[in-house]
Regions:
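Short, conserved turn/kink motifs that form compact alpha/beta structural patches or helix kinks used as
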Residues: 70-103, 107-110
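Charged, amphipathic alpha-helical segments
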Residues: 36-56, 80-93
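Short, compact, well-ordered microdomains
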Residues: 98-131
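Cationic, low-complexity basic patches in intrinsically disordered or flexible, solvent-exposed regions
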Residues: 6
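A short, Trp-centered hydrophobic/proline-enriched beta-strand micro-motif
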Residues: 62-72
Length: 131
């Protein structure tokens, strides 16, 4: 059963013409991946919040360079500037996000190459601890 907070996240996503099922599916993947690779147990609310934030990050990356942080499996954070603006140029097709995919491709502006990161490793807001 969804709580008020989860319904609110789903309603925001639905207003952007994306289904609540997409966010829920990505939240389940994030929750499972965080436990397997980072040893972190996420609540349903936290995984839903992260899933929604990942969707927003992808939307911003389609149009511009975005600064974000990745948590490595050893706990350190890596600051990255990435984009998806040239995805279609390099790969010959537009980027279609798949909510069941554990990885997010991005073009690292500083390294000047295409890389992937684990969606569960993306760190948002106050939980960022730079080392």
């Amino acid at each position: 059963m969804l709580t008020f907070q989860h319904k609110e996240i789903c309603m925001k996503k639905t207003m952007k013409n994306d289904s609540c099922l997409t966010v829920s599916r990505r939240a389940a993947i994030i929750r499972q991946d965080a436990e397997e690779n980072y040893g972190t147990l996420l609540t349903l609310g936290e995984s839903m919040r992260r899933a929604y934030q990942v969707e927003e990050l992808i939307d911003r990356m389609r149009w511009d360079n975005v600064d974000f942080c990745l948590q490595r499996t050893d706990g350190t954070c890596l600051s990255i500037t990435g984009t998806l603006t040239e995805y279609e140029h390099y790969f010959g097709r537009p980027y279609y996000e798949n909510p069941s995919n554990r990885f997010l491709p991005y073009y690292d502006v500083h390294c000047r190459k295409w890389l992937t990161c684990r969606v569960a490793g993306i760190v948002f807001g106050s939980s960022v601890k730079k080392n």
